[in-house]
Amino acid sequence: MTALGAMSGTSLDGVDAAVVETDGLAIFGFGPVGYRAYSPEERAVLRAGLGRWAGPEVEAAGDLVTRAHAQALAGFEGVDLVGFHGQTLAHEPRGRGTLQVGDGAALAAALRRPVVWDFRSDDVQLGGEGAPLAPFFHFACAKWIGATEPLCFLNLGGVGNLTYVDPSFERPEVPGALLAFDTGPANAPVNDLMQARLGLPMDEGGAVARGGTVETGALELFLAEPYFSRMPPKSLDRNDFAEMIGLVSELSDSDAVATLTGMCAAAVAQGMEHCPRPPARVLVTGGGRHNPVLMEMLQVSLDCAVEPVECVGLDGDMLEAQAFAYLAVRVARGLSTSCPGTTGVGALVGGGMVSLPDEA
């Protein structure tokens, strides 16, 4: 099948779109990609909805997400179905649940194609974390690149996600094939601080962090958070570590950004200790791989090669969008999308609902 996946991540930068050829098991090829950036005004609308479960801010964010995705996906042709993640505004798997806004039924009507959406709710309702959901796709990617030794995929978006893959197993559902969890905050605290202090959306190229020094006292307080002592699988909301900025409030701009960047790397290093076997390499995806300071910190902290996924022919900007294209096909075929090793759910779960164009 030819599937089009779309992802609007916690970094709030825009909509990624990508085509994957797959049967929901193997990857046969990758197709065209696209990107639709959010304007500063649109990012402000999304930020206003973060951490909320209902109300006008949530409705405004949902309308924006649906409209932006319709624009981002309209130009793709020859697509059998669409995988639509939506925008996560709130995520409390042990509390109120999970909320991704955006109307999949309206999107199906606009695109005149079936849309698979609401990927996380079933997993959470059945006791899982609802995240990460990309690991089944990461397993397929490991097979596609011909990996023979255990490896990790590290996604550095607003939140960091780690997937440990043992490609010696034939299927991702087999116990031991996958372990996945959120490592901790990644780009989100840096982006928020850059916006608040300097009016910039991110630390471009790690330039601000490069001029600073990591404050070890703040780093130690950060690593003492209970989340890091929990065994995986486990997941985070974008705002779970909002107090991080308070830990660096008295520091200079450069020291504050360097410290938040160091916190991301330290959280990954601590999370890697949970891997069943030492991975041969860590393949980094997401916006964080463009930050050379963060990549250097990771390489110093880890005992294996740390490389962008482009080193193996994958597209680090589009991997999550590709993941939801792949997962959409799995949903359409009645295959599972999460398992105990990825979200902690008690059994295999095939999440996601399908909206057809004539249902809207």
UniProtKB/Swiss-Prot annotation:
UniProt similarity note: Belongs to the anhydro-N-acetylmuramic acid kinase family.
Pathway: Amino-sugar metabolism; 1,6-anhydro-N-acetylmuramate degradation; Cell wall biogenesis; peptidoglycan recycling
Residues engaged in binding ATP: 9-16
HAMAP family (UniProt xref): AnhMurNAc_kinase
Gene that this polypeptide is encoded by: anmK
Protein name: Anhydro-N-acetylmuramic acid kinase
Top class in the EC scheme: transferase
GO biological process: 1,6-anhydro-N-acetyl-beta-muramic acid catabolic process; amino sugar metabolic process; peptidoglycan turnover
Organism from which the protein derives: Ruegeria pomeroyi (strain ATCC 700808 / DSM 15171 / DSS-3)
Protein EC: 2.7.1.170
Function: Catalyzes the specific phosphorylation of 1,6-anhydro-N-acetylmuramic acid (anhMurNAc) with the simultaneous cleavage of the 1,6-anhydro ring, generating MurNAc-6-P. Is required for the utilization of anhMurNAc either imported from the medium or derived from its own cell wall murein, and thus plays a role in cell wall recycling.
Name of a matching Pfam family: AnmK
A GO molecular-function annotation: ATP binding
Annotated catalysed reactions: 1,6-anhydro-N-acetyl-beta-muramate + ATP + H2O = N-acetyl-D-muramate 6-phosphate + ADP + H(+)
Keyword tags: ATP-binding, Carbohydrate metabolism, Kinase, Nucleotide-binding, Transferase
